[in-house]
């Protein structure tokens, strides 16, 4: 496990200064979710959703945190509004694929 952790750290270090534009389809999904659940300002993910809409060009480190959310969330027990405010499956698929491809690219 230590070698794998070191390997991921080295890959991430090569990408740390990069920024990425969130695709329109992901932003559109987040905007729709905010419109639908705009009254739920205390739900985890609300601030992130607003931040992503206002700042669609995100540093790699923020995308890693989003990936970590999806990697660790218990889909069977998560508040569905929270999950959607974090981007839902649209964001999950995009961020997983982006980070995987970027890590391959820098190897």
List PLM regions with ranges.
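Extended terminal accessory/targeting regions
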Residues: 2-107
């Amino acid at each position: 496990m230590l070698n794998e952790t070191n390997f991921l750290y080295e890959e991430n270090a090569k990408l740390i200064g990069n920024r990425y534009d969130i695709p329109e389809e992901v932003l559109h999904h987040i905007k729709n979710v905010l419109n639908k659940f705009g009254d739920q300002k205390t739900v985890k993910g609300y601030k992130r959703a607003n931040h992503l809409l206002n700042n669609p060009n995100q540093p790699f480190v923020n995308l890693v945190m989003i990936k970590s959310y999806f990697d660790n969330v218990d889909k069977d027990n998560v508040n569905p509004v929270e999950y959607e405010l974090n981007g839902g499956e649209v964001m999950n698929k995009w961020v997983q694929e982006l980070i995987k491809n970027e890590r391959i690219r820098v190897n």
